Curated annotation (Swiss-Prot):
<keyword id="KW-0238">DNA-binding</keyword>
<comment type="function">
    <text>Transcriptional repressor. MXI1 binds with MAX to form a sequence-specific DNA-binding protein complex which recognizes the core sequence 5'-CAC[GA]TG-3'. MXI1 thus antagonizes MYC transcriptional activity by competing for MAX. Isoform Short, which lacks a segment, has a much stronger suppressive potential and associates with a SIN3 homologous protein.</text>
</comment>
<dbReference type="GO" id="GO:0001825">
    <property type="term" value="P:blastocyst formation"/>
</dbReference>
<keyword id="KW-0804">Transcription</keyword>
<dbReference type="InterPro" id="IPR036638">
    <property type="entry name" value="HLH_DNA-bd_sf"/>
</dbReference>
<feature type="compositionally biased region" description="Polar residues">
    <location>
        <begin position="207"/>
        <end position="228"/>
    </location>
</feature>
<feature type="compositionally biased region" description="Polar residues">
    <location>
        <begin position="57"/>
        <end position="70"/>
    </location>
</feature>
<dbReference type="GO" id="GO:0001227">
    <property type="term" value="F:DNA-binding transcription repressor activity, RNA polymerase II-specific"/>
</dbReference>
<keyword id="KW-0678">Repressor</keyword>
<keyword id="KW-0805">Transcription regulation</keyword>
<feature type="compositionally biased region" description="Acidic residues">
    <location>
        <begin position="173"/>
        <end position="183"/>
    </location>
</feature>
<dbReference type="GO" id="GO:0005634">
    <property type="term" value="C:nucleus"/>
</dbReference>
<comment type="subunit">
    <text>Efficient DNA binding requires dimerization with another bHLH protein. Binds DNA as a heterodimer with MAX. Interacts with SMC3. Interacts with RNF17.</text>
</comment>
<feature type="region of interest" description="Disordered">
    <location>
        <begin position="160"/>
        <end position="228"/>
    </location>
</feature>
<feature type="compositionally biased region" description="Basic residues">
    <location>
        <begin position="43"/>
        <end position="56"/>
    </location>
</feature>
<feature type="domain" description="bHLH">
    <location>
        <begin position="67"/>
        <end position="119"/>
    </location>
</feature>
<dbReference type="GO" id="GO:0046983">
    <property type="term" value="F:protein dimerization activity"/>
</dbReference>
Amino acid sequence: MERVRMINVQRLLEAAEFLERRERECEHGYASSFPSMPSPRLQHSKPPRRLSRAQKHSSGSSNTSTANRSTHNELEKNRRAHLRLCLERLKVLIPLGPDCTRHTTLGLLNKAKAHIKKLEEAERKSQHQLENLEREQRFLKRRLEQLQGPQEMERIRMDSIGSTISSDRSDSEREEIEVDVESTEFSHGEADSVSTTSISDLDDHSSLQSVGSDEGYSSASVKLSFAS
């Protein structure tokens, strides 16, 4: 206890010395380089600085909050504009009827939900019908293949018969053509023989004429001899 009192007294003495030193420094106009405890007046002058820093912090935070608020307002404005545009498009897509002149957002969304359910039900029915048609198409295709089996064999047989007949016909036509060619060649031979015969006949006739003329000449010469 006594020791604590001595420490307090010592601190009071140091404080008194510091105050005296500060007063002398102020009077003489120079500062002391001796480290000492801060004066009560200096301690009293620090809170205004803290207040100024708090003011700066508060002003900076207020500027930040103002910027954040303006950004939030801009985002909210864009969101509402986008929502309004979506609602206008929804009015065009959903059949509302002529009696609905004014629509609330809730009523429009309920009608959109009902319309979507109706479209989904129609899509399910269409899908089921499409599957039935595909099954029927596969069945008819198999049936057609089964029916085309015997017909295909008959068609192949008829094609083979037709090709055989056509080949026989072509052979007979070829034989007829050969016969015609031979007859044509024979007629050409007869013509040559006829022509040679006629030529020989002409030669015989000319020889007969020459003989007759010779006989006439000889008879004429005989007559002349008798006359002389």
